[in-house]
Amino acid sequence: MSQEMPSIDHFNQMNFDEKAWHVWHKATFLIVRNSRNYRVNLYYLNGFYIQLWYHITRNKIDRISATESPRVVDTFLKMIELDLDGIMNSN
């Protein structure tokens, strides 16, 4: 397996096992969200985002997809809730 950081074009041309290897060994985990029967992990690698779709009941990774669009982060950011009043009044 190549140790080089792939471009998004190269990553998208890889087979499933090669994509998984780069996710496990090179990508940075950012956040996870649930979507119906899936747990969707978001990773960052070499200027692009990777979504890993893990099917919970089948215990299987169904899809690994990459995009350069930061809009993919939006669905994950909707999950974050900040209690700004609690933070501001904690002192």
Stretches found by the model and what they are:
Residues M1-N91:
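Polybasic/polar functional segments that serve as interface/processing modules
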